[in-house]
């Protein structure tokens, strides 16, 4: 490696907030299926704790040896609705508690996979799992849950969309902060290393290592060098920077895979912000030329950023996967927090932005009196964007119980704080109550 490249990487880590956001081990639980729920849960605990026993230790070794910060160590498992369905259990909270115990024993930050895939309808375990989500999140602190309600090939399960609005309200009634551990997806991916939406897909290997990178600060600093130049140069600069950032993810993932004796899966190319100053996706958009994120042109600037990150990153690693784009979680981005608080960025503009970037309406706080139907409508809109555009979209929304516009919900750490945003108060109740299934779009028929 050239000396200049080494020095560049050191500078990125020391001054520009470059890090590996997560090393996530995916673990299949299909060999844990049992008609006896208690036996199944013991198998799950044993499989997770055996498979990932060295994950935290190896991550610490890599960080120490190479000076590359590795922020999170995480686990994703097969959707529990598929595993628990064979048992006679009527309530799946105990499975979440088992996941929590395993995560605590290993010292990992989060564990995902308390999930159900209902894009085309419910199977026997799906309804039980969804009904268990509020109690499961209340009983745990490291467990993450997700439900996939639509896809380009299957359409949108409007019954599930309606149910998830009610579930989110139920969670918020107990503790709004628990809502940050639940994501409602369309076109969920099997190899996502990021939480709260990670689960281990049914077509994945028995165990796999996936890596998520982070580097908004690096991209912003690089763009400062091309101020006043054409947008072509901006795109090229982002591509070059994304290559360097992703190369580090490939390097760390390869070493972790080798030391853990687990196959290396993918690098997720997503730019993931944090509440730290200088680590913001919104600031990149402003560096491209917007007076503020939320201004006309925001969606175009984000589309440019997202595409350039993919083009640069895809050359730097063996396999790209996950969500791979730019995240726009309001509470986790310092400049977005300021823009929302000042009224420069609203939910409608964020929804437009989700058509061209990773995921969707993420870490958004809404007034506590927002109806379940309104939340379901937000989910339906995002699922429609994902379904029609053949991309992953999602909603992670926090109804701030007892709070209104102008207040804030404090999460702490990497999750930051979310200003409560105004929501259109016209109700979609009759639409959501219709239920049924929104058919897949005509362009989904590829065969």
UniProtKB/Swiss-Prot annotation:
Gene3D superfamilies assigned to the protein according to its UniProt record, in alphabetical order: 3.20.70.20
Alphabetized CDD domains for the sequence: RNR_PFL_like_DUF711
InterPro entries cross-referenced by the UniProt entry: UPF0210
Disulfide bonds: none
Top-rank lineage group of the source organism: Bacteria
UniProt similarity note: Belongs to the UPF0210 family.
Complexes and interactors: Homodimer.
Name the record gives this protein: UPF0210 protein lp_2507
């Amino acid at each position: 490696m050239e000396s200049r490249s080494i020095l560049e990487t050191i500078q990125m880590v020391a001054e520009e907030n470059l890090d590996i956001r997560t090393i996530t081990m995916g673990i299949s639980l299909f060999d844990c299926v049992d008609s006896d729920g208690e036996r199944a849960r013991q198998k799950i605990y044993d499989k997770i704790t055996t498979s990932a026993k060295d994950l935290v230790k190896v991550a610490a070794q890599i960080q120490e040896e190479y000076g590359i910060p590795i922020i999170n160590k995480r686990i994703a498992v097969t959707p529990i609705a598929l595993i628990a369905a064979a048992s006679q259990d009527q309530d799946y909270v105990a499975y979440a508690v088992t996941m929590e115990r395993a995560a605590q024993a290993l010292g990992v930050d989060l564990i995902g996979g308390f999930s159900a895939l209902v894009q085309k309808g419910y199977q026997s375990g799906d309804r039980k799992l969804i009904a268990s989500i509020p109690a499961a999140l209340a009983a745990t602190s490291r467990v993450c849950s997700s439900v996939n309600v639509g896809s380009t090939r299957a359409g949108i399960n409007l019954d599930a969309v309606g149910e998830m609005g009610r579930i989110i309200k139920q969670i918020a009634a107990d503790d709004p902060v628990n809502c940050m551990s639940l994501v409602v997806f369309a076109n969920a991916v099997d190899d996502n290393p990021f939480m709260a939406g990670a689960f281990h897909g049914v077509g994945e290997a028995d165990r796999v290592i996936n890596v998520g990178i982070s580097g908004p600060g690096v991209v912003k600093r690089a763009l400062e060098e091309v101020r006043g130049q054409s947008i072509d140069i901006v795109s090229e600069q982002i591509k070059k920077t994304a290559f360097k950032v992703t190369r580090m993810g490939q390097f760390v993932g390869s070493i972790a895979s080798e030391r853990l004796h687990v196959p290396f899966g993918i690098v997720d190319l997503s730019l993931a912000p944090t509440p730290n100053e200088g680590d913001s996706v919104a600031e990149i958009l402003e560096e491209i030329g917007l007076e503020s994120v939320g201004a006309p042109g925001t969606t175009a600037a984000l589309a440019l950023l997202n595409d350039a990150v993919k083009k640069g990153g895809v050359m730097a690693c063996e396999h790209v996967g996950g969500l791979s784009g730019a995240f726009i979680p309001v509470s986790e981005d310092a400049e977005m927090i300021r823009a929302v608080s000042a009224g420069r960025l609203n939910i409608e503009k964020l929804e437009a932005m989700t058509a061209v970037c990773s995921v969707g309406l993420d870490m958004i706080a809404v007034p506590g009196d927002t109806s379940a139907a309104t939340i379901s409508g937000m989910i339906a809109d995002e699922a429609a964007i994902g379904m029609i555009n053949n991309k992953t979209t999602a909603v992670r929304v926090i109804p701030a119980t007892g709070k209104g516009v102008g207040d804030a919900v404090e999460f702490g750490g990497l999750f930051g704080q979310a200003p409560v945003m105004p929501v259109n108060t016209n109700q979609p109740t009759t639409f959501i109550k219709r239920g049924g299934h929104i058919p897949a779009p005509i362009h989904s028929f590829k065969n």
